[in-house]
């Protein structure tokens, strides 16, 4: 496929949470992880796989194939709203699965003087030379990385997402060592990332974040169940039906532990 073509799940014209200022958000299709609390399961299915395409279309979901130039042209309509630090954010799905497209989009954006931000789980990151060569190019065009750390414990992370967190933590260290600004995000899930009587994993995560030199913000987001109807419509069993959102007390405690680091 043309490496400047992206599989676009959707776009958002005035995003206010995925990076500084108002953002034009590009949500890319496809993700390898299967986070038990994911609220966008329709973004899992990678393309151009024909079975995945047929499945999505049978549920009324049409993913667009677009060039980076075309997406940038759409984004530029909103440039006048970015005077206070806004710009373009690419999210997912998992944006790094379409790294060639992101590189091209951000390269074009930087030519226009636009702030760029990548929201990622870090799951595709690897220290292999072939990937790092592309990742280093991406770093040249990326002003901010938002890294979602699902769980600090490797085994718990596997249970939660289906994957180890080793490469994700490696990515955080790599960004830190190479002077790339990042925000850290963490979703608070009762019984999974915070225990009923213990915050040990939050303290472990806090220690890891303290070891990073370029973290400028830490966000703790409460788990929610807003994605349940999507699972039902796709015929996918919801993995954690009995888990409720965190209490205000739990959320406040988690933010006290994590958000005061920077």
Can you say where each PLM-predicted feature lies in the sequence?
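Conserved AdoMet/S-adenosylmethionine-binding subsite of the radical SAM
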Residues: 72-87, 92-221, 226
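Short glycine-enriched, charge-decorated loop/helix-capping segments at active-site entrances
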Residues: 44, 57-61, 158-164, 235-243
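Flexible, glycine- and charge-enriched loops at secondary-structure boundaries
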Residues: 28, 61-65, 161-165, 195-199, ...
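Short, electropositive, low-hydrophobicity segments enriched in small/polar residues
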Residues: 23-25, 34, 96-97, 126, ...
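Generic domain-boundary/flexible-linker signal
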Residues: 19, 37, 46-49, 99, ...
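Auxiliary Fe-S-binding modules of radical SAM enzymes
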Residues: 1-20, 73, 188-262
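N-terminal [4Fe-4S]-dependent radical SAM core
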Residues: 1-65, 77-84
């Amino acid at each position: 496929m043309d490496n400047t073509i992206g599989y676009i799940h959707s776009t958002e014209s005035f995003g206010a949470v995925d990076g500084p200022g108002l953002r034009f958000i590009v949500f890319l299709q496809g993700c390898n992880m299967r986070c038990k609390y994911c609220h966008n399961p329709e973004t899992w299915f990678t393309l151009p796989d024909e079975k995945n395409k047929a499945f999505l279309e049978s549920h009324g979901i049409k993913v667009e194939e677009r060039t980076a130039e075309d997406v940038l042209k759409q984004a530029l309509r909103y440039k006048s709203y970015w005077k206070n630090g806004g710009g373009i954010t690419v999210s997912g799905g998992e944006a790094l699965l379409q790294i060639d497209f992101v590189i091209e989009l951000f390269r074009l954006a930087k030519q226009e003087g636009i702030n760029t931000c990548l929201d990622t789980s870090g799951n595709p990151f690897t220290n292999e030379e072939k990937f790092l060569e592309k990742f280093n190019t991406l770093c040249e065009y990326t002003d901010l990385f938002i890294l979602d750390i699902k769980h600090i414990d490797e085994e718990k992370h596997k249970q939660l997402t289906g994957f180890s967190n080793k490469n994700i933590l490696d990515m955080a260290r790599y960004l830190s060592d190479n002077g790339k600004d990042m925000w850290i995000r963490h979703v608070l899930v009762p019984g999974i990332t915070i225990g009923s009587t213990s915050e040990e994993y939050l303290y472990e995560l806090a220690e890891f974040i303290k070891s990073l030199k370029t973290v400028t913000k830490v966000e703790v987001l409460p788990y929610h169940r807003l994605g349940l109807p999507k699972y039902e419509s796709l015929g996918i069993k919801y993995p954690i039906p009995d888990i409720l959102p965190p209490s205000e007390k739990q959320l406040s405690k988690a933010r006290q532990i994590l958000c005061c680091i920077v």
